[in-house]
Amino acid sequence: MPPCSPSRATFFEGRYPFRTNVRNAIVTLDLANSQVSPYEITTPRLLRQKGYVSAVVGKMHLSGSDLNPDNNPLGDDVMRELGWDYFDGYLDGGPYPIDTSAGGVGDSGDYPCGFVPNTRDAANGADQGICHLPGGGESSMSIDDYDTPGQACLEQWGVFVPTGVAAAPDFDLQNGYYTGDWIINNMDGSDDRAPVADSRSRGYRTVLETDRALDWLAQVREQQPDHPWMLSVGYSAIHTPLQPPPRALLPSDAEQTGGYDCTDLSNIRQQRVMTKQMLEAMDHEIRRLLIQSGVARTAGDSLQYDPHSNTVVIIVGDNGTYAPSVRWPFDPTRSKGFPYQTGVWVPLIVAGPMVNQPDRDIGHLVNSTDLYSLFAEIAGIDLEQAVPAERDLDAQSLLPYLTEPVYSSSGSTGIRDVNYTEMGANLAAAPAPPCVIPSYNVCVQIFPQQEVCEDQGGSWYGPGSEVGGVPDSGFDSCCAVNAFLGEEAVDIMPTSQRAIRNAHFKLVQLERPQCEAGEPTGESVLSEEFYSVNEETPVPEIDRAAEDLLADTAPDGLPEDGLDPRANYAALKADITTLLASAAECPGDGNLDQRVDQQDLANWQRFSTSNNGMSSWYDFNHDGHTDEADKAIIDANFGNDCRL
């Protein structure tokens, strides 16, 4: 899927976003109705049927967080409530913004990468000082031992105070990849939390994510040696903000980044170097995870999977690359956040004892929902028996691709005929303020805070905007932004984007809001684009704007020769129409069983009396409150069986 939360939800639910309402990256304004429901049969619940214990470490981004408790009805227990036995991570979608005061040592903006640079930055740099640690310890650091003492201190969990500077380090400030707010749901049912000043939350996230994954594996192997297990590690990298990783994770000849400006998103070269180094660091840590867990071993300069570990390894990306990091032959203007190939075509790597003839490429269509099926197949679970038919699973089988090498042969037929992707607006009581992202030339209403908008390279047009001429109260819509910009108006992000493709062609449908006199009319207009696509190497045919086959003709004007674009358009249009029409509607049913009954009343009672009766999956009118108005919807539909 184009953004992170919908992809991650499909991994563990096996259902498309239009069935679950998880249509976009979950932010603080999004209601519980657009978060993974506790009534879903998630992967850990599914695998528990076969005795599996399960854990999530790092990022998952399936729910709200305490940044807005009103929209996070399950609180810090949410991952346990969704089925996992253990959670050690964070509920937010990515690292916090970089602390450009470097722990309160300078003014905001002095240190754009979150640490004091060396004196190559003549204005703000320092080559010696004291590294203060959160527990009260300290040590002297200088350029005699470190290229950039300030960065080395940050890597060691500290705050660097240059010699001659009178400043008290502030350990309560979040700082990009080097701090966090970790929530721990223990196997015994107890909970713990490591806030930003806690030494357990300090250090480079990719390293901490690996450490904690290994810690859980050691725990479960010791305490439950006879149980199969599933561990999901959600690495934060390389989500924005881009920030230099520890030097120890990089090749010895890696470029020095101590003088970089991490906040200068217009410096594409610096952005690319940091992207590459963060990927190198993640590669280093994945390697460490696999080796120290006993799943792989070194073989010269390579990594060799060990089939005797009896462990399946799956590595997958959750969405396409962020625009400044995109490389040819992909299209940075149609990357993360869009349903085009650059935004949804991601790596999927599988190793395991059942893989017949490893090192094969599979050229067939695979959807993120299909991982749900693969998890079940690995555990020996029949989804048709384990999941009620009314759940409308979209996952299709993946295991045959691993066990049957014939699928790698030229001319073989894949399991999927078509592949579907989508992104839209999550349900919210009020929309987010507008943010214009110049690299996409688009206005979006996704990000709830100015800092998040700016981390994505955007210009904030909400309250407190620093754009000249914008009122202090900001604008409340992208329509108002375009009225303000006049002839320099930008595109407005579609409220719904979806695409369906087969082996040769791709149909894209976009619904854009309509504006009148600087205000949204509440109406949207559907447009379609149609492309020829393939996975040829080294340069695949992808869906660039200039290649839209419908740009200059109506569908009935498409050619019928060659691969017959006209017939393919008609088939894909019929497929997507049928698919979207399969969405189930059952007013008053909050627990997804397609019935409105006493259980729904009991569940409504639970959520109307907990968390101050705010947002929940029983807030049927989507006003952010679980109240009598929602109970009235249950009462009006009581006894309905929507399966009939």
What are the language-model segments listed below?
Residues 1-15, 56-68, 90-94, 234-241, ...:
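Short, solvent-exposed turn/loop segments enriched in Gly/Ser/Thr/Pro and often Arg
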Residues 69-82, 241-242, 292-358, 364-367:
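Histidine-centered active-site microenvironments of extracellular/periplasmic hydrolases
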Residues 23-24, 32-37, 49-52, 61-228, ...:
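Formylglycine-dependent
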Residues 213-273, 319-333, 533-536, 542, ...:
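Active-site His/acidic residue clusters
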Residues 581-644:
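Cellulosome-associated attachment modules in secreted, modular CAZymes
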Residues 83-86, 91-98, 108-109, 321-327, ...:
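C-terminal cap/loop subdomain of S1 sulfatases and analogous C-terminal strand-loop tails that border
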Residues 1-3, 32-41, 199-207, 269-284, ...:
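A short beta-strand-to-alpha-helix junction
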Residues 207-221, 255-311, 583-584, 588:
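A long, amphipathic alpha-helix that forms part
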